Design a protein with these regions (language model features):
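A short acidic, Gly/Pro-enriched loop at the edge of an enzyme's catalytic core
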Residues: 1-6
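A short beta-strand submotif of the Rossmann-like class I SAM-dependent methyltransferase core
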Residues: 8-11
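Conserved class I S-adenosyl-L-methionine
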Residues: 34-81
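Short acidic N-proximal helix/loop "leader" segments that mark the beginning
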Residues: 78-90
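A short His-aromatic
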Residues: 13-14, 28
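Short catalytic/ligand-binding loop motif for oxyanion handling, primarily in non-cytosolic enzymes
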Residues: 14-15, 43-47, 133-140
Length: 263
C-alpha cells in the first residue's frame, strides 16, 4: 500500500541502518507524496551537547555517575535556573533524562546527510522548521527555468541557504550574521561535536578536548567574541586538573552568553 503522507517522528536517526530505513519508507510514498521527519541535528545541538559534556566531565572528575541522584543535583545547579525561563512542555527531570544523559541524543543527523539520501531517491526538500530558505521569495515566477524544479537543484539551494544560517542554528536564534563554511570546515566542526558526544558513551572523559581551528574561526569572525571567550574558558576549566565542581558551576552560571544558549 502507498501513502500520500508518512510521518516518521524522532526515531529514524537513532536506528543502526537508518539510511536503509529512510529509503525504505520513501518506497511507501505515492508519486508526489510527502515524508515528514524530525531528528537530532549535529550542528543545531552544539550547545545542548556542550551542556551534556560539561555535566559528564564534572561528574567524571568527582567519580559521580551522571545518571545518579547526585548527577541530577549537579545538573540542576548548572542548568535549572535558565531552563525554568524557557517556554517548555517538560520538566527539568524529563529533559535531564531524555537529553542531557541519554546516549540516543548523540545519534545525530544533519540536513546535509538527509539531502544526500534524498538525492539518491529523486526526492526534494519541500520545507523545514525553522524556515530559513527564502531564496524563492526573490524570483519572478515567469523567470523560473524548468531546470530549477530538478530535485537536486532544489536541494542544493536548501543546502546553500542552510550554510548561510548555520550560526543561527548553533546559537538558537537569528543573530543576523550570514556565514558560508566550506564542506571541509563543516566536517571539522562535526568532528569536534562528535568528540564531545563520546562522553555519552563514557569515553574520552580522561582526556583533554582540543578545539580545532574551525570552531575558533566560527566564534571569532562572526561578532561572537563574547561567546568565544566563555566557550574557551569553560573548556579550559574542564581540561584543567581541578575537580572543584562548584568552580565549574559558578563559572557557567555567571556567564553572560553561554548559559542562555540552547539546542
Amino acid at each position: 500500500e502507498k501513502f500520500d503522507v508518512i510521518i516518521a517522528e524522532g526515531f529514524l536517526n537513532t536506528l543502526n541502518k537508518r539510511d536503509y530505513y529512510f529509503k525504505k519508507i520513501i518506497s511507501f510514498l505515492k508519486p508526489g507524496g510527502l515524508l515528514i521527519i524530525n531528528y537530532d541535528d549535529v550542528y543545531g545541538g552544539f550547545f545542548e551537547f556542550l551542556k551534556s559534556y560539561i555535566l559528564f566531565k564534572s561528574c567524571y572528575k568527582n567519580n559521580i555517575k551522571p545518571d545518579s541522584e547526585k548527577g541530577l543535583r549537579i545538573a540542576e545547579k548548572l542548568f535549572k535556573r535558565e531552563f525554568n525561563k524557557l517556554n517548555k512542555s517538560r520538566t527539568f527531570y524529563s529533559w535531564w533524562k531524555d537529553q542531557l544523559i541519554n546516549p540516543y541524543a548523540a545519534k545525530t543527523w544533519s540536513l546535509q546527510d538527509l539531502i544526500k539520501l534524498a538525492n539518491t531517491e529523486s526526492m526534494s526538500c519541500y520545507s523545514t522548521s525553522p524556515i530559513f530558505n527564502k531564496s524563492s521569495l526573490l524570483k519572478w515566477y515567469k523567470n523560473i527555468d524548468p531546470k530549477d524544479l530538478n530535485p537536486k537543484k532544489i536541494n542544493q539551494v536548501f543546502i546553500e541557504e542552510w550554510k548561510k544560517n548555520l550560526l543561527n542554528f548553533l546559537i538558537g536564534h537569528d543573530i543576523g550574521t550570514p556565514i558560508n563554511l566550506s564542506d571541509k570546515e563543516l566536517s571539522q566542526l562535526k568532528y569536534f561535536i562528535n568528540k564531545m558526544n563520546l562522553s555519552f558513551k563514557n569515553k574520552n572523559l580522561d582526556k583533554k578536548i582540543k578545539i580545532n581551528k574551525t570552531v575558533n574561526k566560527i566564534f571569532y569572525y562572526n561578532r561572537m567574541k563574547s561567546y568565544r571567550k566563555e566557550f574557551l574558558d569553560i573548556i579550559k576549566l574542564l581540561n584543567s586538573s581541578t575537580n572543584n565542581i562548584n568552580k565549574i558551576i559558578k563559572y557557567y552560571t555567571k556567564s553572560k552568553k553561554l548559559k542562555k544558549t540552547w539546542g
